[in-house]
Every structure is written in structure tokens, then in C-alpha cells.
């Protein structure tokens, strides 16, 4: 039987069906227990009218908007072969998602139908939500009212260089997926990572990891280093690398005939240690 399939772009397909949600720009493909390919797309309910809450700016699909409320309350599963699209509400305490279900009962899967466990086992922490949390955490990680008012314990997302340190300004780390094994974890798992420095300083003082448990539960943890620790930040490490004779010579040999040097540093948590990995292109 022949079919004409339209709206084959994963995000546009979901947006056409349910335009009231915000969709992550990073859908991912998983394999279910029967060997079928299924796209997983994280969807969010948002608002900019939540009382007494910090506003942040998000950008999705080229559109910017201010919000002060965001929840990853919906997961969209799309069959990669025939395009069958299913919307699951995963956070039933979210009033916005509940309102959408009441208005559009035929779009969302019935309450009694859960996401298959073999699909849940492949969930990863949603990137857009993580980016918002990382930005807000830089100021609000300290919950002492007097410290918040003074603003003397503010973090900033760590910066790294993408070219030669002497000629390129640092750029903030973007959240990235990597295998992590934190000090309180028994095994390595896929997580989102972002490192922090004290405001206007370069040393690493903490990092945040977002993971999913095997039963589909999102976990977000912050790991702080002692205040007297002196852990090199990415920019400081880059400076050391360029002052190391052998490495500096190799980079100089590559930088000939107009060739540009690009680096993309990653920081990988391994128990109580941070491993810096610096590919050079």
C-alpha cells in the first residue's frame, strides 16, 4: 500500500500537531525491544507570567522568547518508518500540560498508557531545560538570603579558547553530552555536563551533571570543590599547553600556509577527578 508522507522533519511534524509546546532542537534516535527505530523529542510547557521568578531568554528554531517557567512535561515518540506520533505527558503535576490534555484529549496518550520501559531506558537529560537551569544556577545556587542580596557568591559558566589563547577570546562552554562517572555513582553513564568558575575568575569551582536513571527518572546534581582548592580552568590549561615546548612546537608546525587551529575542549568527571580532553584540528 502506497502512502504520501508529509511533514517529515521531526520537529516540524510535532509542531504542526501541537503548536502550543516548545520543542528541543536535539531529537535522538533509539531502538526499541523489537528493533524498530523511534525518534524521541523533548517538549516543554513554558510561561513568562509565573510570579516572583527570574526571567531568562531562550532560543528555539531561530525564535527568541523570555520565560520564567519551564517544565519538560511532554515526551514525543515518532516512529521513524511510518511517522506515527505519540505525545506522552510525563509530569502530571504540571497545570499547563494538564490543561492541554483537557483541551485536546485526542492528541495525548491516555493516562493509563505509559512510555515503554525499553524506550525510557534510552532517555537523556533534555538540553534546553539544562541550559536554562545552568544559567539560573549561576546566581541562585546559594540559598542564603543575605548572600543573594549582596551578590558576592555568583558563578559564571567556564570559558574555553577555540584557537590560540593569545589571539582568541574565550567562549562559554555549551552543555555537552559525555560519559561520566561521578564520585557517588557506581557506573559510567551518559550525562550533560557544564563547569563553573567564580565570577570573573578562571579556576573551576563546581560542575553540574544531568542524567537519566534506567527507569526514566531525570537527575540533576551539582558537585562543588573545596573553597581552598586550586583547580585549573580551561583558559589556564590552554596557556600551560602553549607554554609547553613540545606541544607548542607541534601546534606551530600545524599552523602553516594559512591553516587555522581549532580546539574543542571537554571536561569529563571521573569520580573525584576532572579529565581535560583537548582535540586540536
Task: Please name every model-derived segment.
Residues 5, 15-18, 32, 96-281:
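Accessory, solvent-exposed terminal regions and/or long lumenal/extracellular loops of proteins
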Residues 37-40, 73-76, 84-86, 189-191, ...:
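Beta-sheet entry/capping signal
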Residues 1-53, 71-73, 79-81:
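A conserved hydrophobic secondary-structure block that centers on an alpha-helix together
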Residues 52-87, 206-217:
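A short, surface-exposed beta-strand/turn
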Residues 4, 63-67, 198:
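Hydrophobic alpha-helical scaffolding
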